[in-house]
A protein has these predicted regions:
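S-adenosylmethionine
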Residues: 1-162
Length: 162
Protein backbone atom coordinates (compact mmCIF):
# COMPACT_ATOMS: atom_id res chain seq x y z
CA UNK A 1 0.00 0.00 0.00
CA UNK A 2 2.91 2.36 0.57
CA UNK A 3 3.88 2.17 -3.11
CA UNK A 4 0.28 2.85 -4.09
CA UNK A 5 0.49 6.24 -2.39
CA UNK A 6 3.39 7.24 -4.67
CA UNK A 7 1.61 5.88 -7.75
CA UNK A 8 -1.54 7.83 -6.92
CA UNK A 9 0.51 11.00 -6.50
CA UNK A 10 2.25 10.49 -9.87
CA UNK A 11 -1.12 9.93 -11.53
CA UNK A 12 -2.62 13.03 -9.93
CA UNK A 13 -5.16 11.01 -7.94
CA UNK A 14 -6.14 12.82 -4.77
CA UNK A 15 -9.40 11.17 -3.72
CA UNK A 16 -8.26 7.57 -3.28
CA UNK A 17 -8.36 5.75 0.02
CA UNK A 18 -5.83 2.95 0.55
CA UNK A 19 -7.04 0.28 2.92
CA UNK A 20 -5.66 -3.12 3.83
CA UNK A 21 -8.49 -5.27 5.11
CA UNK A 22 -8.03 -7.87 7.80
CA UNK A 23 -9.44 -10.66 5.66
CA UNK A 24 -12.19 -11.37 8.17
CA UNK A 25 -15.89 -11.00 7.44
CA UNK A 26 -16.27 -8.95 10.62
CA UNK A 27 -13.64 -6.39 9.55
CA UNK A 28 -14.64 -3.05 11.15
CA UNK A 29 -13.85 -1.10 7.97
CA UNK A 30 -16.11 -3.39 5.91
CA UNK A 31 -18.97 -2.86 8.32
CA UNK A 32 -18.50 0.91 8.54
CA UNK A 33 -18.06 1.57 4.80
CA UNK A 34 -20.28 -1.07 3.18
CA UNK A 35 -21.81 0.08 -0.13
CA UNK A 36 -20.17 3.52 -0.03
CA UNK A 37 -17.52 3.40 -2.77
CA UNK A 38 -17.83 4.42 -6.42
CA UNK A 39 -14.84 2.30 -7.37
CA UNK A 40 -13.02 -0.53 -5.65
CA UNK A 41 -9.82 -2.00 -7.10
CA UNK A 42 -8.85 -5.52 -6.11
CA UNK A 43 -5.18 -6.08 -6.92
CA UNK A 44 -5.55 -9.75 -6.12
CA UNK A 45 -2.84 -11.96 -4.68
CA UNK A 46 -1.96 -14.29 -7.54
CA UNK A 47 0.56 -16.74 -8.93
CA UNK A 48 2.47 -13.98 -10.75
CA UNK A 49 2.78 -16.04 -13.93
CA UNK A 50 2.42 -12.86 -15.97
CA UNK A 51 5.81 -11.67 -14.69
CA UNK A 52 7.73 -14.79 -15.74
CA UNK A 53 9.64 -12.91 -18.43
CA UNK A 54 11.15 -10.68 -15.73
CA UNK A 55 11.32 -13.35 -13.02
CA UNK A 56 11.79 -16.73 -14.78
CA UNK A 57 12.80 -18.45 -11.54
CA UNK A 58 9.20 -18.23 -10.34
CA UNK A 59 8.11 -20.73 -13.01
CA UNK A 60 9.11 -23.54 -10.69
CA UNK A 61 6.79 -22.26 -7.97
CA UNK A 62 3.71 -21.59 -10.12
CA UNK A 63 1.68 -24.64 -9.15
CA UNK A 64 2.47 -24.37 -5.46
CA UNK A 65 -0.69 -23.26 -3.73
CA UNK A 66 -2.77 -22.41 -6.80
CA UNK A 67 -5.95 -23.83 -5.25
CA UNK A 68 -5.29 -21.79 -2.10
CA UNK A 69 -4.78 -18.63 -4.18
CA UNK A 70 -7.99 -19.18 -6.15
CA UNK A 71 -9.94 -19.60 -2.90
CA UNK A 72 -8.34 -16.48 -1.44
CA UNK A 73 -9.14 -14.46 -4.60
CA UNK A 74 -12.76 -15.57 -4.39
CA UNK A 75 -12.99 -14.45 -0.76
CA UNK A 76 -11.29 -11.11 -1.44
CA UNK A 77 -13.64 -10.40 -4.36
CA UNK A 78 -16.71 -11.23 -2.27
CA UNK A 79 -15.57 -8.89 0.51
CA UNK A 80 -14.67 -6.11 -1.92
CA UNK A 81 -18.09 -6.40 -3.57
CA UNK A 82 -19.67 -5.37 -0.27
CA UNK A 83 -17.88 -2.02 -0.52
CA UNK A 84 -19.30 -1.00 -3.91
CA UNK A 85 -22.38 1.21 -4.02
CA UNK A 86 -25.18 0.73 -6.56
CA UNK A 87 -23.93 2.00 -9.92
CA UNK A 88 -20.34 1.72 -8.69
CA UNK A 89 -17.64 -0.45 -10.17
CA UNK A 90 -15.38 -3.21 -8.94
CA UNK A 91 -12.15 -3.90 -10.82
CA UNK A 92 -10.47 -7.26 -10.35
CA UNK A 93 -6.84 -7.43 -11.51
CA UNK A 94 -4.07 -10.01 -11.51
CA UNK A 95 -0.62 -10.38 -13.03
CA UNK A 96 -1.45 -13.97 -13.94
CA UNK A 97 -1.93 -15.81 -17.21
CA UNK A 98 -3.80 -18.72 -15.62
CA UNK A 99 -7.52 -18.84 -16.53
CA UNK A 100 -8.47 -20.21 -13.09
CA UNK A 101 -7.25 -16.93 -11.59
CA UNK A 102 -8.74 -14.77 -14.32
CA UNK A 103 -11.69 -15.59 -16.58
CA UNK A 104 -12.89 -18.47 -14.41
CA UNK A 105 -12.67 -16.30 -11.30
CA UNK A 106 -14.60 -13.48 -13.01
CA UNK A 107 -17.31 -15.84 -14.26
CA UNK A 108 -17.64 -17.48 -10.84
CA UNK A 109 -17.98 -14.04 -9.24
CA UNK A 110 -20.77 -13.06 -11.64
CA UNK A 111 -22.59 -16.35 -11.05
CA UNK A 112 -22.43 -15.83 -7.27
CA UNK A 113 -23.29 -12.11 -7.38
CA UNK A 114 -26.35 -11.47 -9.58
CA UNK A 115 -26.32 -7.86 -8.39
CA UNK A 116 -23.22 -7.25 -10.53
CA UNK A 117 -22.73 -7.34 -14.29
CA UNK A 118 -19.59 -7.36 -16.41
CA UNK A 119 -18.64 -4.11 -18.10
CA UNK A 120 -16.68 -4.77 -21.30
CA UNK A 121 -13.13 -3.66 -20.54
CA UNK A 122 -12.79 -2.34 -24.09
CA UNK A 123 -15.58 0.16 -23.36
CA UNK A 124 -13.76 1.39 -20.27
CA UNK A 125 -10.39 1.50 -22.07
CA UNK A 126 -11.62 3.53 -25.03
CA UNK A 127 -13.51 5.95 -22.78
CA UNK A 128 -10.40 6.97 -20.81
CA UNK A 129 -7.34 6.23 -22.96
CA UNK A 130 -6.32 7.66 -26.34
CA UNK A 131 -4.55 4.45 -27.39
CA UNK A 132 -6.23 1.63 -29.34
CA UNK A 133 -7.67 -1.36 -27.48
CA UNK A 134 -4.75 -3.83 -27.20
CA UNK A 135 -6.76 -7.04 -26.84
CA UNK A 136 -9.01 -9.23 -28.89
CA UNK A 137 -12.72 -9.73 -28.43
CA UNK A 138 -14.15 -10.40 -24.99
CA UNK A 139 -15.26 -8.62 -21.85
CA UNK A 140 -11.87 -8.66 -20.12
CA UNK A 141 -8.51 -6.96 -20.49
CA UNK A 142 -5.87 -9.61 -21.03
CA UNK A 143 -2.34 -8.56 -21.92
CA UNK A 144 0.24 -11.20 -22.78
CA UNK A 145 3.98 -11.05 -23.42
CA UNK A 146 3.51 -12.69 -26.84
CA UNK A 147 0.76 -10.40 -28.10
CA UNK A 148 1.48 -7.14 -26.30
CA UNK A 149 5.18 -7.26 -25.40
CA UNK A 150 4.26 -6.61 -21.76
CA UNK A 151 3.99 -8.65 -18.63
CA UNK A 152 0.87 -10.76 -18.45
CA UNK A 153 -2.03 -8.89 -16.92
CA UNK A 154 -5.76 -9.46 -16.50
CA UNK A 155 -8.55 -7.12 -15.46
CA UNK A 156 -12.30 -7.50 -15.22
CA UNK A 157 -14.70 -4.63 -14.55
CA UNK A 158 -18.00 -5.27 -12.78
CA UNK A 159 -20.80 -2.81 -12.10
CA UNK A 160 -23.19 -3.13 -9.19
CA UNK A 161 -26.76 -3.03 -10.51
CA UNK A 162 -28.69 -3.55 -7.27
Amino acid sequence: LARAKLRFKRAGVENAERVQLTGRDDDPFLKKKATQFDLVLVDAPCSGTGAWRRHPETKWKADAGLDRLVALQKAVLARAARMVKRGGRLIYATCSLIPAENEAQAEAFLAAHPNFQAVPAETVWTSVLPTPWPCGAGDYLKLTPARNGTDGFFAAVFERTA
